[in-house]
């Protein structure tokens, strides 16, 4: 093996990167009806118009924190793939234990 570390499948010299879609305002993908459905599931009857943007910003911060912790677990284990257990442990670390996905 030529010093490529674990699972050295690296053939060639890297080459050109494929086209990648530029990620910009993906938080708008959480649509107004989707937020309404989540609120309905939580027992909400009427929703103020200002709620939607606020919900998106709170959700974005929450996901950033969970993903940051999950990626930290992944990097510590010297992996490149985030597993469901990484997410479970990240949620547990934040005091939001999730059952049903192992661990």
From Swiss-Prot:
Protein name: Histone H4
Keyword Membrane set for record: no
SMART domains membership: H4 (SM00417)
Annotated localization: Nucleus; Chromosome
Similarity section: Belongs to the histone H4 family.
CDD domains in the cross-refs: HFD_H4 (cd22912)
Residue numbers bearing the N6-acetyl-N6-methyllysine modification: 6, 13
CC annotations in GO: nucleosome; nucleus
Modified-residue entries (N6-methyllysine), positions: 6, 9, 13
PTM: Glutarylation at Lys-92 (H4K91glu) destabilizes nucleosomes by promoting dissociation of the H2A-H2B dimers from nucleosomes.
Pfam family, one: CENP-T_C
N6-glutaryllysine PTM sites in chain numbering: 92
Assembly with partners or alone: The nucleosome is a histone octamer containing two molecules each of H2A, H2B, H3 and H4 assembled in one H3-H4 heterotetramer and two H2A-H2B heterodimers. The octamer wraps approximately 147 bp of DNA.
Main location: nucleus
Organism of derivation: Mortierella alpina (Oleaginous fungus)
UniProt-listed InterPro entries: CENP-T/H4_C (IPR035425), Histone-fold (IPR009072), Histone_H4 (IPR001951), Histone_H4_CS (IPR019809)
Function, as annotated: Core component of nucleosome. Nucleosomes wrap and compact DNA into chromatin, limiting DNA accessibility to the cellular machineries which require DNA as a template. Histones thereby play a central role in transcription regulation, DNA repair, DNA replication and chromosomal stability. DNA accessibility is regulated via a complex set of post-translational modifications of histones, also called histone code, and nucleosome remodeling.
Classification via Gene3D superfamilies: Histone, subunit A (1.10.20.10)
Higher taxonomy: Eukaryota, Fungi, Fungi incertae sedis, Mucoromycota, Mortierellomycotina
This protein's encoding gene: H4.1
DNA-binding interval(s): 17-21
Gene Ontology molecular function: DNA binding; protein heterodimerization activity; structural constituent of chromatin
UniProt keyword annotations, A-Z: Acetylation, Chromosome, DNA-binding, Methylation, Nucleosome core, Nucleus
